[in-house]
Amino acid sequence: MNTIGVLKVSGHELDDPHFLAGLTGVIRTMTQPLVLVHGGGKEISAAVEQAGLPVEFVDGLRVTTPEVMAIMQMVVCGSINKRIVTALVNAGVRALGLSGLDIGLLRCEPYRPNGRDLGRVGVVTEVDGAALRHMLTLGWLPVIAPVALGSADGLSYNVNADMVAESIAGTLGTTELIFVSNVPGVLVDGQVVPRLTPAAVEDYIASGVISGGMIPKVRSALAALRRGATSVRIVNLAGLRDGGTRFVTEEAGS
């Protein structure tokens, strides 16, 4: 099988119908096997607020009570996932909408950063890579919502979509993980940095050049390299084919 592309698209980007149309247009011309992981973002928050529940985040992670989990699952596995699948199928792509619950595709354990209880927030511990590879050999494009099955309690968990993409890319091995963002890559003085090593990433984080929501993305990029992804990039839609910032190991960067 050719190098597998794992695309991660944020929910914020998917709020824009023009973005989804553009993404679909690019995907239909790509010849490599693809897996698409998506987030939920503002659409989840809006539904939570409409239900009269608080919207809380800790270090970028959504505090997920059982009530919030039910809403999150409805939105991200339902309306968002099916909106993406519909657009792709209408463009001639054999897209299959899934979450990590389906066939136990993603299993997880509770995530407790610094001992903080965030509720039903999980960290992926297992990916059914064989099932994903089988789908790809059939010519299908799995579209995966970031909900996983708790290994110990059998409950559904909210999992950060960047972490899901990183785990899938690492499990599949010969993959290129592509974070499709609203920026053309990692910017330094307004210019895209074409290549970054782990050491350079840590220096940029320490100096504040890389900050905010870009930090978890670059950390997921490095984690995917450690787990076996062949290549990791952060791009915008225009640079999806070969643009953006490519993350490389220290050896490759020297």
UniProtKB/Swiss-Prot annotation:
Its EC number is 2.7.2.8. It is found in: Cytoplasm. GO terms for biological process: arginine biosynthetic process via ornithine; L-arginine biosynthetic process. Pfam families: AA_kinase (PF00696). InterPro entries: AceGlu_kinase-like_sf, AcgluKinase_fam, ArgB, Asp/Glu/Uridylate_kinase. GO terms for molecular function: acetylglutamate kinase activity; ATP binding. It comes from the Bacteria. The keyword tRNA processing does not apply. Keywords: Amino-acid biosynthesis, Arginine biosynthesis, ATP-binding, Cytoplasm, Kinase, Nucleotide-binding, Transferase. Pathway: Amino-acid biosynthesis; L-arginine biosynthesis; N(2)-acetyl-L-ornithine from L-glutamate: step 2/4. Transmembrane segments: none annotated. It catalyses: N-acetyl-L-glutamate + ATP = N-acetyl-L-glutamyl 5-phosphate + ADP. GO terms for cellular component: cytoplasm. Substrate binds at residues 40-41, 62, 158. The record marks 8, 217 as: Transition state stabilizer. The keyword Transport does not apply. Signal peptide: none annotated. Belongs to the acetylglutamate kinase family. ArgB subfamily. Catalyzes the ATP-dependent phosphorylation of N-acetyl-L-glutamate. This is Acetylglutamate kinase. It comes from Chloroflexus aggregans (strain MD-66 / DSM 9485).
